Structure formats: C-alpha cells, structure tokens
Amino acid sequence: MGKGEELTTTKYLIHAQINANGIVEKPDVVGAVFGQTEGLLSNDLDLRELQRTGRIGRIQVMIHSNGGRAKGEIVIPSSLDRVETAILAASLETINRVGPCEAEIHTVKVEDVRAVKREQVVNRAKEIYKNMIESASPASMRMIEEVREAMRVHEISEYGEDRLPAGPSIHTSDAIIVVEGRSDVLNLLKYGIKNTVAVEGVSVPQSIGNLSKKRTTTAFVDGDRGGELILKELLQIGDVDYITRAPKGKEVEDLEKDEVLVALRDKVPTAQFLANHNILSESDSKNSHKKHNGKHNNKHSNNKHQQHETKVKEEVQIEEIPIEDDETKLMKDMLKEFEGSGCGAILDEALNMTQEVEVENIYEEIKNIETSADTVIFDGIISQRLVDVASLKGIKRLVAFRSMNIVKKPDNLKIITMD
C-alpha cells in the first residue's frame, strides 16, 4: 500500500499515548512498534503483513520533546474485527524502549469509526430535512394541508335530526365527547378521536341531551366564557358524567395533540368539577344536583333537590340505602369475613359461594361470569368500572368496604358498603 494511499475500509482507530525518557523522533516510534511486536503475535496479526495487505493503515505519530523528555500520540487505523483490533491495541503496551530511550505506551481508547459516521449521517440528515421544510413553498404547504383537511372532512359524520357534526364512531361508541363546533370535531378527528359530537352553538339541541342519558358522556369545552355557557346549557338538558376544559383562553379547535390528550386524561366527575370551579349560579346548581340524583330516583326527585341545595360545593356521591335492613346487615356481616384477605366471592341467589376470587382480578372475574350470579362481595373498593361490568352481567348486589367516584348507578344494581 503506497504512502499516499488512504485506507478506505477503516473500522476502528487505535489511540495510544507514548512517554519516553529522552528525545525520540517519529521514525524511532514507528520502528519500535514494528520491531518489538514482531513475533509476539501469530503470523495473522503481524503488523508488517497486515499493513501490506491493507488490513491496517499507515501508523500516525504526533510527538514533541520538552525538557529532555518526549511524549505524544500514536494512531493506528484498523479494518480488523473487534477482537483482533483489541489484541493489536493491547500488544502496543508491551513496548518498553524507543530508540535508545526507555519508553511506555498506553492504549487510551479504540474508536469505532462507523459509529462516528452514523452520527454524522444523522446530523446531516436533520440539516437536510430542515432545509427541505424551510424551502417548501407556501403554496405546497397549503396544498398538503388541503388534502389532509379533505381526508378529515370525508371521515366526519352527522348525528340526529339536527345533522350535528360528529365523529364516525358516534353511533357505536359507549362513551361520547361533546364539543362546541364542527372545527372541534375535526381537530379531535385529526388525533384519532372519533366518538365526538358538536352542539353547534350555545343552544344545545335536545338530541344531545337524550344521547347523553344513554352514553357515558364527557363535556370538552373551550377555556373561555363561551365554554362555561355551553356547559351550563348542557347540564340543564343532558346528563354529563365527566367534564374537562381546554387551557384557559384556548379553544378546543386550536389544541395540539398533547394538550388534547392531557385534557381528556384529566377529566373529572361532574359534581367534583362544579364544586372545584364554582361556575354555576345557585339555581343552575340546584337543577344540576336534582338532575344527577333524580336520574335514578325520579320518584323522590323533590326530596333529593332539597337535600342537595346547600351542598353545591361538596362532591356528590351516589346515595346508598340509608336504612339498614336485614339484608344489608347480613351482607355487612359476610363482608367482615373477608376483611384484610384481599379476596372476595361470587354468590348465587341463595347466597351460596359459587366462586372465590382475588381482588386484584375482580374485574376480569366479573366480566367472565357465565353462570347466574346474584352478589359479588370482596375486600376492596367499588369503582364505576366495576359497577358498569356488574350491571352488564346482571349482578344484583356489589358489596365492599367503600365506593369511589361512582357517578352513574344502574337501577338494577344495589351497592352496599361499610361507609
């Protein structure tokens, strides 16, 4: 390999440091490297042969002298594999003389040239991509956005006689998200959220109110006064389970994906939202509490209205049986047997245990019930999720130590707790 020829297949660079107790020159160092490693390793790793066949490159030496001592760096390009390169790097440390002087060589590192090249490729690709974006003409960007918008518009559906803008899943989803306008539906559709419906104005159509009573409903309103007005109207005629808002001063149609996901993740039960934000007038609050409690207890709606009139700022919990009858006492006595066990049981109509369950698997166990079951009793907390699946499976009683965040209780299900 000629002196001017560069090694083009370099995989690694061996970096070594040399210290000599005297003044030495570059040829002295190169000679010591070849001479003192000769015969040390097998013929396959002989430096002269490796250089002749192009498997190592030209040895580079940068050295300088000061105060009668010399120090510098040795760099050897290698196209050998990792193991062979490591052996070669270690062999340099056996050199103890350079020219007439005692010397010491220490391998500092073995650099992976390909990793450096990959990093260069990534950085350069970023620059090229950035330039592509910046150089794209406004007309091209508008054209791309028009195509994307057309695709979203094609997916948009309609709901009810009012032909309200809605996502394609509005007719099949068990949960819906109510927003203000068509632009909000389009924006959420862009992020893959398809169970939305728009009220199209401050006056909420009755069809939305009726739909909200059949589905688990989340109101997603703008973070301004308009959002509050729509929320008030929706609470007057509908049944809202959860509420969330865009950040203050922002509209749902302008939110980025992360903002949308955070807002939906942080939704809270309606009663808790009203108590925290205090955005309803007193009469509105009365109507809202009456509606939430009267939904499942219409015969006693007037009494419930009076009971909750002074509790506007307290979280509304599902009312459980206030008078402890014999059945309730029996259930509580049975529950005490499971206290601290982390277990529960599925009972038939005669209150005979048909299956013992682990609390951590309680949801799946109820979901997979195939035989007739009457009661589920367990050492844990009753959640809205358990209420929903128990109702679906025809369970008549859920018995546990307490309940949490239950906003919708089916008429066919009785909840008994120690609270």
UniProtKB/Swiss-Prot annotation:
GO terms for biological process: DNA replication, synthesis of primer. Residues 174-260 form the Toprim domain. It holds the Pfam family Toprim_4. Binds two Mg(2+) per subunit. GO terms for molecular function: DNA-directed RNA polymerase activity; metal ion binding; poly(A) binding. Gene3D superfamilies: 3.40.1360.10. One of its GO terms (cellular component) is exosome (RNase complex). Its cofactor is Mg(2+). Keywords: DNA replication, DNA-directed RNA polymerase, Exosome, Magnesium, Metal-binding, Nucleotidyltransferase, Primosome, Transcription, Transferase. Mg(2+) 2 binds at residues 222, 224. CDD domains: TOPRIM_primases. PROSITE patterns: TOPRIM (PS50880). Residues 288-305 have a biased composition (Basic residues). Residues 277-314 are annotated as: Disordered. It catalyses: ssDNA + n NTP = ssDNA/pppN(pN)n-1 hybrid + (n-1) diphosphate. Mg(2+) 1 binds at residues 180, 222. Its EC number is 2.7.7.101. InterPro entries: DnaG_primase (IPR050219), Primase_DnaG_arc (IPR020607), TOPRIM_DnaG/twinkle (IPR034154), TOPRIM_dom (IPR006171). Belongs to the archaeal DnaG primase family. Forms a ternary complex with MCM helicase and DNA. Component of the archaeal exosome complex. RNA polymerase that catalyzes the synthesis of short RNA molecules used as primers for DNA polymerase during DNA replication. Also part of the exosome, which is a complex involved in RNA degradation. Acts as a poly(A)-binding protein that enhances the interaction between heteromeric, adenine-rich transcripts and the exosome. NCBIfam families: PRK04031.1-1. This is DNA primase DnaG.
